[in-house]
Every structure is written in C-alpha cells, then in structure tokens.
Amino acid sequence: MNNHIEALSYYLGAFVDELARLNVCDVVISPGSRSTPLALLMEQHEQIKTYLHVDERSAAFFALGMAKAKKQPVAILCTSGTAAANYYPAVCEAYHARVPLLVLTADRPHELRDVGAPQAMNQFNLYGSFVKQFMEMALPEAREPMYQYVRMAAGRAVASASFAPMGPVHMNFPLREPLIPDFSLDGLWEQGCGEYTNRVQQGSMTLTSEYIRSLIKRLSRLEKGLIVCGDDSHLELVEVIAEFAEKTGYPVLADPLSNLRTGSHNQTMIIDCYDTFLRNELLKDTWKPDIIIRFGGMPVSKALTQYIKKQESAVHIIVDESGKWRDPALMTTEVVSASDVAFCKAMTEHMQKREQNDWFKKWKHINDKTKETLREVEAYDTAFEGKVITDIVRILPEGATLFVSNSMPIRDADTFLFTNEKKIHVMANRGVNGIDGIISTALGASTVCEPLVLVIGDLSFYHDLNGLLAAKLHDLNITIVVVNNDGGGIFSFLPQYESKEHFESLFGTPLGLDYEHVVKMYGGSFVRVSGWEAFREEVQKGIIERGLHVVEICTNREENVQLHRKLWAKSVIEIKDMLQGDTE
C-alpha cells in the first residue's frame, strides 16, 4: 500500500473521529481541492453532519449562527489561498462575540510555500489576534504517536474554543498530493484512540465565602443600585438574574439580547424602556446610583452608556469569568472573575430580601409611563419601522427566535421590544456590529431554532444575498422581513445627515433594487406588502409554511426619523414634571 495514502487516511481519520467524539458534529464545508481528504472523511463519518456552502464568507457566518444557537463549537473547512481569507469577517465577529468556532484551513506543504506555487499564500497566523489559538498542524505520518498527537490537538482546540471566553481557534493543515483517502483501510476511525485519549471538563469559576459575605454586607448599605444586563450566552442566567434582582431590590436594565424581557420568569424588576427616558439630561444628572452591577456585553443603548459614564461616584462592578471584561464606558472599579450564573446563585443563597424602596419605585414608574407612550406605535397606520418589531412580537409563537440585524433593527428592538410573558429568543451579531453576513448567521441559527424570523434592512440584505443559497441547499425554514427604506436609514439619525450636499451619495446610498427575482432564484417566495394587516398575514404565513419566505415592507427614511424623534420628545416632555425637584 502507498504509505502516503495510509498516513493521510489514518491521520486525518483520527482527527475527524476525535471531533465527533468531542461532540463537534456540525461542519460547514466550502468546496476546494486541497481540503479534499478532510471533506471526504467528514462526509463519510456517521456522526458528523456536513453543510455545503460555496461562498466562504457566507459559510463562516452560517457556522457562526449555528454555534451561537447551539452554544458549542461548529467547524468550518476550506481550501488554501483566498478561500481562507474570506473567513476573516466571521472570525472577527466570533472572537468579539465569544462564539466557539473551529476554523480548519487546508494548505500547501512547506516546500510549496513562498515559491510561486498556485493557490498558495502565507496562512500562518492568518487571523492574527482574532483567534484564541493558532495551530500549525504537522504533515500526516503513519505512526501511532502522530495519531495520538492529532487527537490531542483536536481536544485542545475544542477546549480552547469552548472555555471562557469562548471564541474561534484556527487549525492549518498542510497536505501533500495525492489527496484521496483510502476508505477500505481497517480501523480508519480508531487510530490513536485509547484509554489515554483525553476528555476535557470545564469547571465553573466560583466565589470564596469570605468575598460573598463581604459583598452582601456592602450591598446591604447601598440602597440605590442598578443591574445592567447585556448580551449573554448562559441559558440559566435569566432565572438567576431575576432572583438576584428581587433579593437586592435593584432595577434591571435589560438589553433585548439579555433575553430577560420575555418569558415566564419574574419580570417585576425588569426595566425595558430606559433607552428612551435616559435621553432626558435632568434624569442623567440627578438619578445617581450608589452601585452598578453589570453582566454580559455592553448593551446596545447609547443613552445608557452615556448615563453610566456620568456615574463617577458609583461603584461599578463587572461580573465576567474571563480576564477580558467589556467596558467601553471605562468606569469599572471592580471585576468579579466568576461565572455570572455562579455569582448570582451564591449571592442569592445568602442574601436577605430587600423590600422595594423609593429608588426602585421611581425607576419602575418612569418606565411604565414611557412604555405607555411608546406603545402608541401599535395603533399607527403609517409604515413605521418601530412597529415592525411590535407586530412581529405579537405574531411569534412561544419559543420562537427573533434575529435582528445591526443598524436600525437592533435599535428598534431595544426601544420597542417590551416585556412579555411569551418566551421569544432574541439574537444578533453584536461582536463587531457589522452588517455583513447577517442572512447567513440567521440561517445558521435556523438549523437549531425554529421558527425563526429575521428583521433586516435593505442594505444588510443586499450585503449577504449569497447567504440565501443555504436555505435552498439545506431546505431551511426562515422568514425574512426586509425593511426597505432604500438606503442606510441609521445615518439619518447621525450628524452626517446635516451634510446635505453629500449625504445621499456617501451615507444614504439608495440602491433602488428589486429583490423579488433574486429571492426566487434561490427558491424562496417574495411578497411586498402595504398595510399592517397584510404584513401580519404574510409573516404569519411564513412562520407556518416551510422554506424561505421574504416579506418586504417599504418605509420612508425621513418620515421614520421624524416619528422616532416625535415619540422620544413626547416621552421627555411627559416625564419632565416627574423629575422636577428630584435631585437625589
């Protein structure tokens, strides 16, 4: 037998089998020659499910969506050259959003590097600081120690991707021709697998009893506190945060991605309209908390970030089990290096419940009054973008997923996604906050979460049209709501809008595209609606039926800005009297 083929088959067979043994059973593959042996072995392994995606950029975002939904590593595989470079945007997002990805790139062997060989470039540390770990893999050899080595490398990669903070790991495989493995070999999946093969078990970072007692004593003296919750991946966090908040008596400013706004948990302490009422300058200057305790990523709301920056006299505690806590406000005074779930459980177990005080009551009161104003959009007849969120939430069934794109949709979710006993899982790409790869990420998530509705603007939709191919190839079910204001709607809210001479060409960027034909090219249905009754009917139809459904609603950018500002101004006026004389 050809020793090279035997080495290639057993070495890569051991690697693929170890991935499956470690429960990395989903692989998104883009076609290419140098990655042939890995692709064939993955396709052949009975425990691994493969997804084909031709465009590497979309493929990587698709895997990102799966990994976000599963909360466990998903692998991506491509050939050498610029194919690997196209993974870069999704790798950056995965790193900053703390999503576990295994990035597997095939490469030319060392003798074909830097000599002008085709489809060869330097892939060493290709993703730089945007991966948790880079592994330059050894060339295949038909020796037992090499089979053990490649299994150990798989284990280390999965552990690195999975441990806090989760993130992407890059493994680069140099491979020589010929590239076709021999599936007739005995024990193809068994090489290097024995009693010594490691399993990595992640523990939970906890607090010392001394620290718990000390912090509880401090909290008992600090009556005016706030709990701020951003995007967080822990499934248990919703219940334990709600219980912790009730014990402390502190209001919870809950970002929509915290998933604290919806569900059957106790929502008494949840504040959901802070992005609107924190625009009031008097409130920012006079409502001074003694302590702010933060969990998860930084919330979407700019008004909240500005408010936090003003709280110079407060204690700012961030709970983060990694050493890379997130605080763009630069106000951290203490970092608790522990699992947020473990932190809340430990504190709640030993705390006495504080009765609701005036501090909580005034936050709750102003939140309720603000919500009354914002709910007026539910009666609007005009095509207002904020109402897209309120109407979809009404339609979605229990347990559904709402994926919101960056730019305006996530901000409208922040403003108009109110507390609701119906559980709706909210997702978005808030690592680097780009508009690229949104369709692909949502489609990846849809392999795990059904039904799923994506709300996306027309520019973001255009940016990832290639991603629609996954819905066709893999028979996926998704309803995509395209909010088409013919351009970049968010820029109308920013100072750039005042540059009238160049605004449309540089920022408004109207495309004037009709997306109907491209959606049908990918096997989907497309409908453009006018009127809210038709909108609700079509979204409901998309949720019930299988396949790709795109519902387009056209809005006016200028009118949308005016309606948003009208609501914010009305809210500010209504709460002004409530704040007069309140200087505490």
From Swiss-Prot:
Phylogenetic classification of the source organism = Bacteria, Bacillati, Bacillota, Bacilli, Bacillales
Q: What does this protein do?
A: Catalyzes the thiamine diphosphate-dependent decarboxylation of 2-oxoglutarate and the subsequent addition of the resulting succinic semialdehyde-thiamine pyrophosphate anion to isochorismate to yield 2-succinyl-5-enolpyruvyl-6-hydroxy-3-cyclohexene-1-carboxylate (SEPHCHC).
- Subunit architecture: Homodimer.
Q: What chemistry does it catalyse, as a reaction equation?
A: isochorismate + 2-oxoglutarate + H(+) = 5-enolpyruvoyl-6-hydroxy-2-succinyl-cyclohex-3-ene-1-carboxylate + CO2
Keywords, sorted A to Z: Magnesium, Manganese, Menaquinone biosynthesis, Metal-binding, Thiamine pyrophosphate, Transferase
Q: In which pathway does it act?
A: Quinol/quinone metabolism; 1,4-dihydroxy-2-naphthoate biosynthesis; 1,4-dihydroxy-2-naphthoate from chorismate: step 2/7; Quinol/quinone metabolism; menaquinone biosynthesis
**Which top-rank group of organisms is this from?**
Bacteria
Its Gene Ontology biological processes? menaquinone biosynthetic process
Q: What is its EC number?
A: 2.2.1.9
- Give cofactor(s), names only: Mg(2+); Mn(2+); thiamine diphosphate
Annotated protein name in UniProt:
2-succinyl-5-enolpyruvyl-6-hydroxy-3-cyclohexene-1-carboxylate synthase
* Organism of origin: Bacillus cytotoxicus (strain DSM 22905 / CIP 110041 / 391-98 / NVH 391-98)
Tell me the Pfam families matching this sequence. TPP_enzyme_C, TPP_enzyme_M_2, TPP_enzyme_N
